[in-house]
């Protein structure tokens, strides 16, 4: 028959164990069982506070992200509006670029139509009408910043003049002696160079 009696020393502390426990309690000022309980409770508090702080930080980050997304969408929409308005302005500028210039040419057209409708054998009147029309056309061109080049006496400029020939002349070499065909510039940009003859070197 097996012996089921437990060792009494496993349940009942010996005098030596009791003396060691009492010495430890005296050194700490409180029983060891009570000292372990607050420590365990103190260790649980950060674990409870940490999730609450993390949730608050996550909520703040999500709110900031939503704000940035909204700002981005507004900026994108505004950029698209500016781009569309710019395209419309460019299209209008191309479409009506010569509107003002064409308006200045209308009086010239009126004068030419009137001259054709009114026939006369008086050459003096015909010449007078042509001169008037020419003045109107010149004025219309000048309003459009188109100016004639008539560089007689000026130094030859290959950017504004086209030399047809060089002729003996009293002027300094490379001086424009005669203009065979006027040139024209628009806002300092050459539309057509003037055809000229130039003084030859002596």
From Swiss-Prot:
<keyword id="KW-0963">Cytoplasm</keyword>
<dbReference type="GO" id="GO:0006457">
    <property type="term" value="P:protein folding"/>
</dbReference>
<dbReference type="GO" id="GO:0051082">
    <property type="term" value="F:unfolded protein binding"/>
</dbReference>
<dbReference type="GO" id="GO:0051087">
    <property type="term" value="F:protein-folding chaperone binding"/>
</dbReference>
<dbReference type="InterPro" id="IPR013805">
    <property type="entry name" value="GrpE_coiled_coil"/>
</dbReference>
<dbReference type="GO" id="GO:0005829">
    <property type="term" value="C:cytosol"/>
</dbReference>
<comment type="subunit">
    <text>Homodimer.</text>
</comment>
<dbReference type="GO" id="GO:0042803">
    <property type="term" value="F:protein homodimerization activity"/>
</dbReference>
<dbReference type="GO" id="GO:0000774">
    <property type="term" value="F:adenyl-nucleotide exchange factor activity"/>
</dbReference>
<feature type="compositionally biased region" description="Polar residues">
    <location>
        <begin position="1"/>
        <end position="14"/>
    </location>
</feature>
<comment type="function">
    <text>Participates actively in the response to hyperosmotic and heat shock by preventing the aggregation of stress-denatured proteins, in association with DnaK and GrpE. It is the nucleotide exchange factor for DnaK and may function as a thermosensor. Unfolded proteins bind initially to DnaJ; upon interaction with the DnaJ-bound protein, DnaK hydrolyzes its bound ATP, resulting in the formation of a stable complex. GrpE releases ADP from DnaK; ATP binding to DnaK triggers the release of the substrate protein, thus completing the reaction cycle.</text>
</comment>
<keyword id="KW-0346">Stress response</keyword>
<dbReference type="InterPro" id="IPR009012">
    <property type="entry name" value="GrpE_head"/>
</dbReference>
<comment type="similarity">
    <text>Belongs to the GrpE family.</text>
</comment>
<keyword id="KW-0143">Chaperone</keyword>
<feature type="compositionally biased region" description="Low complexity">
    <location>
        <begin position="21"/>
        <end position="58"/>
    </location>
</feature>
<dbReference type="Pfam" id="PF01025">
    <property type="entry name" value="GrpE"/>
</dbReference>
<dbReference type="InterPro" id="IPR000740">
    <property type="entry name" value="GrpE"/>
</dbReference>
<feature type="region of interest" description="Disordered">
    <location>
        <begin position="1"/>
        <end position="58"/>
    </location>
</feature>
<protein>
    <recommendedName>
        <fullName>Protein GrpE</fullName>
    </recommendedName>
</protein>
């Amino acid at each position: 028959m097996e012996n089921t009696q437990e060792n009494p020393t496993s349940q009942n502390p010996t005098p030596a164990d009791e003396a060691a426990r009492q010495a430890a309690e005296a050194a700490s000022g409180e029983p060891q069982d009570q000292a372990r309980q607050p420590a365990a409770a103190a260790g649980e508090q950060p674990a409870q506070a940490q999730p609450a702080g993390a949730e608050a930080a996550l909520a703040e980050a999500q709110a900031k992200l939503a704000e940035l997304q909204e700002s981005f969408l507004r900026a994108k929409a505004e950029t698209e509006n500016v781009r569309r308005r710019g395209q419309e302005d460019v299209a209008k500028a191309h479409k009506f670029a010569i509107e003002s210039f064409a308006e200045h040419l209308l009086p010239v057209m009126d004068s030419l139509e009137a001259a054709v409708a009114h026939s006369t054998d008086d050459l003096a009147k015909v010449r007078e009408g042509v001169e008037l029309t020419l003045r109107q056309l010149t004025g219309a061109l000048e309003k459009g910043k188109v100016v004639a080049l008539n560089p007689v006496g000026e130094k030859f400029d290959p950017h504004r003049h086209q030399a047809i020939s060089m002729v003996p002349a009293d002027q300094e070499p490379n001086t424009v002696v005669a203009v065979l065909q006027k040139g024209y510039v628009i806002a300092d940009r050459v539309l057509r160079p003037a055809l000229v003859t130039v003084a030859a070197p002596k």
